[in-house]
Amino acid sequence: MAAAPSESIPSVNKAWVYSEYGKTSDVLKFDPSVAVPEIKEDQVLIKVVAASLNPVDFKRALGYFKDTDSPLPTIPGYDVAGVVVKVGSQVTKFKVGDEVYGDLNETALVNPTRFGSLAEYTAAYERVLAHKPKNLSFIEAASLPLAIETAHEGLERAELSAGKSVLVLGGAGGVGTHIIQLAKHVFGASKVAATASTKKLDLLRTLGAADLAIDYTKENFEDLPEKFDVVYDAVGETDKAVKAVKEGGKVVTIVGPATPPAILFVLTSKGSVLEKLKPYLESGKVKPVLDPTSPYPFTKVVEAFGYLESSRATGKVVVYPIP
């Protein structure tokens, strides 16, 4: 098992932890001396540089899926970007010193790790990680994995292909901004439409991939005469989404419950998807989208969650630097 010099990897580290379910503002506490996780043969230990927050983090803290959650206490954080400091004996893709990023949890809602990314060190399975694109900062890289992989998997499930049209519900969110970009630049959609609130329409336009920006505060997308081959619902409105799809088209959603024939799915995290998207990220065709308030310092994680929970975020909320 290769490692950095043992004296450089401490036995304890700083982390944010909750030991009971509830609102992050009530239950999330800073702990200066949490045990650094031991790695398995197919894992690496990462010195965390940046982490991003996702709605699944605060929903998990609230106990939304406690029946399938790992036992408390929990260090939250799915998305990580950092440097490999130790590798398990079966790891072949990464070595000590590699800059990596990924979504730590292969199955988001079933036994997610208790050692998330809001800590100085975290353990990750080799299969969920990828090498960080050289042109991206750690902040940018940390913003990507869960959101861009979710966008990609949904478009694959919807069978979006070149020449088809797509409508994105919630185009300015962490996932929505990537659905728009991937639909246009990776899947070759002929037309990309997206909904957002009035103040977030400019963001859709700056992405340069949305052909039609719909202000949902002023018009109902389901009443438009134009229908779409694919509707990707990132907000939880499948009852309306199914009215906007062409006959024989596909509706996918990441927010249940799903009105048939919409397909509800939960992401399976794969480093191979990040590797596949690497050329698009390195060329600048697909760009990370950070909320203007990002990054939040490690001391302000509770405030970062409060902002994310307010639904005001446009793009991703990132925590950096992590000591």
UniProtKB/Swiss-Prot annotation:
Amino-acid positions noted as binding substrate in the UniProt annotation, renumbered to this chain: K59
A Pfam family the protein falls into: ADH_N
Single annotated GO MF: furaneol oxidoreductase activity
CDD domains per record: MDR_like_2 (cd05289)
Listed EC numbers: 1.3.1.105
Induction, per UniProt: Down-regulated by auxin.
PTM statement from Swiss-Prot or TrEMBL: The N-terminus is blocked.
Tissues where the protein occurs: Expressed in parenchyma tissues of red fruits. Not found in vascular tissues. Also detected in the achenes.
Family: Belongs to the zinc-containing alcohol dehydrogenase family. Quinone oxidoreductase subfamily.
Protein name: 2-methylene-furan-3-one reductase
Originating organism: Fragaria ananassa (Strawberry)
